A protein has these predicted regions:
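Short helix-initiation/N-cap motifs at beta->coil->alpha
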Residues: 30, 84-95, 214-223
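Proline-aspartate-enriched helix->loop->beta-strand connector
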Residues: 93-107, 123, 222-236
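Structured C-terminal subdomain patch of bacterial secreted/periplasmic proteins
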Residues: 137-145, 152-159, 165-171, 233, ...
């Protein structure tokens, strides 16, 4: 019962935070940027998650150009590759923005440094920075409004919400409580905190994040701490592309339950780190 109460409290707390939301006929992001809540016909998007949502709800016709990724692809791969580019997702070309004459620019938090420059050019801009699962659900609704695909977006939000609810219920029935971490890097060994999107995924999967007791947005996990916590698993993301990188990072890894049971693996960052509906599909696989 206590576990259920804590879970409900956590979910309610999550709904109090927001990345971008609809309020009083306006779309507002957490950085104070505001635009009218309506359909936009020429959108530049540099957030891969928003691009994926747009394609899923049939709103891709509103995209005039995107910020391209350098490593992981954006789904649906073949269709996205055909879109025009205004630079990378972290370094856009302002001249290209002017060339495409957008009526809205949607950027991720990686583009915060460019927001004011875009505004000075006279363009509307919103930051779509979802740091937890509930914020992704809200983002789906917002994307539906700006693309004129509100009904389709609400259908997608409902399906995603049901998947999340099912996962929560199933994890509540489990008696075991796994401990682990999703690693950001190995030199030093850093992990995603509870306040990150991967950290929120772990919470909803009923996993204890061993990084939760270490301060910082990217907590550093010392060899002594890892040995003491003795995680059941260690997963890698971002620049990590091989379990061997984690195993060779410290001689204590082999002494943990994760090492002994060979429960060290790599997650697909394009699924775990994006503000996309696809993260709920991945959670169904991981549960």
């Amino acid at each position: 019962m206590k576990k259920l109460i804590l879970l409900i409290s956590f979910i309610l707390f999550s709904f109090t935070s927001f990345a971008v939301k609809i309020e009083n006929n306006e779309i507002v992001d957490k950085y104070g940027n505001k635009i009218e809540a309506r359909e936009y016909k020429r959108i530049i998007v540099t957030d891969p998650g928003v691009i994926e949502i747009l394609f899923k709800i049939g709103g891709e016709k509103s995209i005039v150009a995107i910020g391209k990724t350098t490593k992981s692809k954006i789904y649906p791969y073949e269709k996205v590759e055909k879109l025009q580019s205004i630079g990378s997702i972290s370094n856009l070309n302002l001249e290209k923005i002017v060339e495409y004459k957008p009526d809205l620019v949607v950027v991720s938090s990686m583009m915060l440094k460019n927001v004011e420059s875009i505004k000075k050019l006279g363009y509307k801009v919103i930051v779509s920075n979802a740091s937890n699962l509930n914020e992704i659900l809200e983002l789906i609704s917002v994307v539906g409004v700006i693309s004129g695909r509100k009904n389709e977006a609400e259908d997608l939000r409902k399906v995603s919400s049901l998947k999340l609810e099912k996962i929560i219920k199933e994890n509540h029935k489990k008696s075991s409580n796994l401990k682990g971490a999703i690693l950001f890097s190995t030199s030093p060994m850093t992990a995603f905190s509870d306040d990150s999107l991967p950290g929120d995924v772990l919470k909803h999967l009923g996993v204890t994040n061993i990084a939760s007791n270490v301060p910082g947005q990217r907590p550093i996990l010392s060899p002594e701490y890892i040995l003491k916590e003795n995680p059941d698993f260690l997963a890698g993301a971002m620049s990590l592309d091989s379990p061997q990188q984690i195993i060779e990072a410290s001689n204590v890894i082999a002494k943990t339950k994760a090492g002994k049971n060979k429960n060290i693996f790599i997650l697909d960052s394009s699924l775990m780190l994006r503000s996309s509906y696809r993260i709920f599909d991945e959670m169904e696989v991981l549960k």
